[in-house]
């Protein structure tokens, strides 16, 4: 059994006290799934842009409405997760069930990163999730940092265990135990591995995808002969994460170095990518740690160098997790629901066929199938929604909620003109809808790919503009406090003490997110002490 002195309240009770209402979607889900739907509604002309009956539109919007972001960001976030069918609450408080669509986004993250890891010489493997407690105790700062979050197994097979087992919070300790058996000579180095796994941390305050008792991640671990190699590796991996964030998820993260107080327990240096969410809070989206020789000395992980002398290895570890899914939601989503960047979207295009008469159905579905085949052959991830249990208006709302980048509509008139209607998720209403796009395969494929690229670029540019407009340059503690109190990030010169950093946290609720790699040139004066400062730091409230 798992024992802990911590007892977690439910996710909903943490975010929604008894005096407040629960997210709209949590109340409506059962009604929505069981509600009989009316027949199809199309315009008299039978085109692919029907005007759904106003009463039906109102009902559909009511059923799948989300709390406006500006009204309650947390409620909006939970509404989107529920309505877009990304995740649900697990039976154990603080856990979540990742539903197929949410997991498909995680698979897209895995697919990209797996390729990059292997291109840079890393191999996948797997370590046990049960770790002897004595392993955790070997590295003093590590056990101190993780002790409050540990889940312990004390009974197995109905008997008290001789030694408590830790349910994996991270794997540096067990990795080093194995590295000591695999590394003997400099010829065994570098040793570079990665594992995709679940981890458990007994969190007090939870939020789906962002912070849960159990979550999925990848964690890389490497061992090197020199400190220079380890440092190069740590920076290489944070660069891979940075490119992934920008190029795949359209999230303009800021890469940098953590302060001493924010450094991973057991690391010499922690590098991070920090993302600004839609509520202007910071999200630590990925980290890469230069572990120095801290774990290798604790576990005796040594190798014989070229002169036959015994040396401790230099190590790194690095990870991203399913919180990236939460980051995508909170960066790009709007009051309609989820909005996915095309490169990370499990479905890039949804095709909605529309007909009014049975005599029109065969021709419309045949054309829709041909369009699907052409796009699939070209490598586009496409879904044909040909079910006749839902109205076109319902489908439009449903797929918009799920954030599909492009929608193709095909009706009888479009079949006659050999064309389709294309709607962009990121451009609402008529402005995002284009009529008369040819069904000719090469023409349609070229158009769709061009629009997907435009959407990817547009989402990044929008997020970048939002980020930059909400970072304030400050030169005094008073200015820092003003920036934080207004909900913005503060960027300013910093060379103050750990105690000063702790004071900022206690008085403003903000922490140093990072010392960005990109630094301004010239003489700087610490905003807190007035002493010379070599770097600027970014302060923000965070998840």
Swiss-Prot record:
Please list the disulfide bridges: none
- Gene3D superfamilies registered for this protein in UniProt: Anticodon-binding domain (3.40.50.800), Bira Bifunctional Protein, Domain 2 (3.30.930.10), C-terminal domain of ProRS (3.30.110.30)
What domain of life? Eukaryota
Q: Which top EC class is named for this enzyme in its record?
A: ligase
Q: Which CDD domains match?
A: ProRS_anticodon_zinc, ProRS_core_arch_euk
Record's keyword terms, sorted: Aminoacyl-tRNA synthetase, ATP-binding, Chloroplast, Ligase, Mitochondrion, Nucleotide-binding, Plastid, Transit peptide
Q: What cellular-component terms does GO give this entry?
A: chloroplast; chloroplast stroma; mitochondrion
InterPro entries, alphabetically?
A: aa-tRNA-synt_IIb, aa-tRNA-synth_II, aa-tRNA-synth_II/BPL/LPL, Anticodon-bd, Anticodon-bd_dom_sf, Pro-tRNA-ligase_IIa, Pro-tRNA-ligase_IIa_arc-type, Pro-tRNA_ligase_II_C
Name a Pfam family for this protein. Answer: HGTP_anticodon
**Compositional bias (Basic and acidic residues) at which positions?**
53-63
What is the name listed in the Swiss-Prot or TrEMBL entry for this protein?
Proline--tRNA ligase, chloroplastic/mitochondrial
Q: Which organism is it from?
A: Arabidopsis thaliana
């Amino acid at each position: 059994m798992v024992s802990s002195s911590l007892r977690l309240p439910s996710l909903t009770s943490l975010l929604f006290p008894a005096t407040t209402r629960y997210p709209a979607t949590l109340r409506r889900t059962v009604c929505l799934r069981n509600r009989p739907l009316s027949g199809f509604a199309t315009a008299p002309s039978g085109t692919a842009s029907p005007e759904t009956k106003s009463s039906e539109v109102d009902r559909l919007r009511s059923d799948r409405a989300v709390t406006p972001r500006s009204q309650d960001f947390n409620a909006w976030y939970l509404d989107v997760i529920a309505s877009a069918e990304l995740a649900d609450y697990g039976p154990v408080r603080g856990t979540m069930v990742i539903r197929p669509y949410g997991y498909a986004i995680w698979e897209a993250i895995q697919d990209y990163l797996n390729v990059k890891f292997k291109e840079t010489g890393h191999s996948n493997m797997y370590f046990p999730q049960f770790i002897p407690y004595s392993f955790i105790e070997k590295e003093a700062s590590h056990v101190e940092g993780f002790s409050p979050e540990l889940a312990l197994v004390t009974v197995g097979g109905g008997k008290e265990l001789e030694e408590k087992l830790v349910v994996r919070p991270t794997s540096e300790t067990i990795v080093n135990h194995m590295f000591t058996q695999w590394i003997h000579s400099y010829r065994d180095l570098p040793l570079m591995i990665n594992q995709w796994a679940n981890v458990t941390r007994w969190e007090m305050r939870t939020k789906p995808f962002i912070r849960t008792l159990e979550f999925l991640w990848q964690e890389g671990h490497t061992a090197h002969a020199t400190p220079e190699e380890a440092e190069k590796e740590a920076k290489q991996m944070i660069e891979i994460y940075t490119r992934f964030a920008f190029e795949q998820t359209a999230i303009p993260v800021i890469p940098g170095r953590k302060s001493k107080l924010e450094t991973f327990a057991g690391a010499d240096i922690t590098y991070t990518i920090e993302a600004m969410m839609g509520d202007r809070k910071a999200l630590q989206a990925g980290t890469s740690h230069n572990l120095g020789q801290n774990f290798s000395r604790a576990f005796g992980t040594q190798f014989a160098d070229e002169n036959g002398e015994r040396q401790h290895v230099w190590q790194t570890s690095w990870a991203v997790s399913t919180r990236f899914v939460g980051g995508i939601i909170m960066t790009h989503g709007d009051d309609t629901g989820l909005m996915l960047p095309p490169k990370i979207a499990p479905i890039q295009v949804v095709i909605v066929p529309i007909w009014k008469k049975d005599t029109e159905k065969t021709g419309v579905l045949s054309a829709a199938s041909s369009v699907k085949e052409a796009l699939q052959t070209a490598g586009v991830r496409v879904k044909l929604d040909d079910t006749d249990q839902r109205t076109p208006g319902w489908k439009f709302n449903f797929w918009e909620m799920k954030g599909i980048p492009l929608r193709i509509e095909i009706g009888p008139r479009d079949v006659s003109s050999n064309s389709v209607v294309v709607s962009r998720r990121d451009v609402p209403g008529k402005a995002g809808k284009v009529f008369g796009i040819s069904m000719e395969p090469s023409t349609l494929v070229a158009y769709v790919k061009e629009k997907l690229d435009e959407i990817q670029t547009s989402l990044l540019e929008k997020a970048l503009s939002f980020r930059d407009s909400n970072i304030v340059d400050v030169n005094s503690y008073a200015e820092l406090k003003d920036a934080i109190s207004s909900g913005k990030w503060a960027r300013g010169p910093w060379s103050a003490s750990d105690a000063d950093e702790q004071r900022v946290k206690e008085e403003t609720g903000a922490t140093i997110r990072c010392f960005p790699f990109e630094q301004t040139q010239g003489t700087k004066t610490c905003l807190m002490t007035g002493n010379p400062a070599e770097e600027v730091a970014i302060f923000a409230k965070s998840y």
